[in-house]
Amino acid sequence: MKNILVISASPRKGGNSDVLCDEFIKGAQQAGHKVEKIFLRNFKVNYCTGCGVCNSTHKCVQKDDMAEIMDKMVNADVIVFATPVYFYTMDAQLKTLIDRTVPRYTEMVNKEVYYILTAADTNAANLEKTVESIRGFTLDCLDGAVEKGILYGTGVWDKGEVHMKTAYEMGLHS
């Protein structure tokens, strides 16, 4: 049994990336894994100020919910990053989360990672910039991270226009 953390960065409750997270979770639970989903919109996560204190203390001086989220990331075997794609990159919520991991990202080792991306664009190749920016964190900064799957929810503008079966199967095989 794996401990899976699904991070939904969507600012819209019930949006397409949220719905795909839920399908991934159904598959992962069917496979017997323990899954927790967090909605970044429900947490207070301030922007990184670049003060540099965390480089020596491994703690952020800001008083918000980021320490709780980092605990979950450190303890997870699998992390799923789900984001809508805005102007060909991840949304601000996910970027802020990634920026704020500096105090503890070296503790996030040997993680399996999945990406769920949703966009109005119909061409998955146009989302590669988004994937590369997330990989800049997961594969370049997290020791031993292994990319296990990417779901491109393309051509989805309105809520509900998503690739449900693919998300379920990705979770089932996590």
Describe the predicted segments one by one.
Residues 92, 105-148:
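Short, glycine-/small-residue-rich phosphate/pyrophosphate-handling segment
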Residues 1-82, 88-104, 146, 152, ...:
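N-terminal beta1-alpha1-beta2 submodule of the flavodoxin-like/Rossmannoid cofactor-binding fold
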Residues 85-87, 120-121:
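Short glycine-rich anion-binding loops that position phosphate/pyrophosphate groups of nucleotides
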